[in-house]
Amino acid sequence: MAEVAPAPAAAAPAKAPKKKAAAKPKKAGPSVGELIVKAVSASKERSGVSLAALK
């Protein structure tokens, strides 16, 4: 009584190649870093600005 290996499952159906995500258009306006620099420089606080104050 020789053991017979089970037959491999049927080959998975060929998957369609993944499409690349559509390139997102760049948003107009200043970058986040520029906005932070402007907010901190406009602040009158001498000790800096907290994260909560920036939001």
Swiss-Prot record:
Short name of any one Pfam family annotated for the protein: Linker_histone
Composition bias type Basic residues, residue spans: 16-27
Low complexity composition-biased segments: 1-15
N-acetylalanine carried by residues: 2
Domain H15: residue ranges: 28-55
GO cellular component: extracellular region; nucleosome; nucleus
GO molecular function: DNA binding
InterPro entries: Histone_H1/H5_H15 (IPR005818), WH-like_DNA-bd_sf (IPR036388)
Signal peptide start and end residues: none
Keyword set, alphabetical order: Acetylation, Antibiotic, Antimicrobial, Chromosome, DNA-binding, Nucleus, Secreted
Biological process according to GO: defense response to bacterium; nucleosome assembly
Cellular location(s): Nucleus; Chromosome
Annotated region (Disordered), positions in chain: 1-28
Keyword Transcription: no
Family to which the UniProt record says this protein belongs: Belongs to the histone H1/H5 family.
Function of the molecule: Histones H1 are necessary for the condensation of nucleosome chains into higher-order structures. SAMP H1 has antibacterial activity against Gram-negative bacteria E.coli, A.salmonicida subsp salmonicida, V.anguillarum and S.typhimurium and Gram-positive bacteria B.subtilis and L.ivanovii.
Entry protein name: Histone H1
Source organism per UniProt: Salmo salar (Atlantic salmon)
Lineage: Eukaryota, Metazoa, Chordata, Craniata, Vertebrata
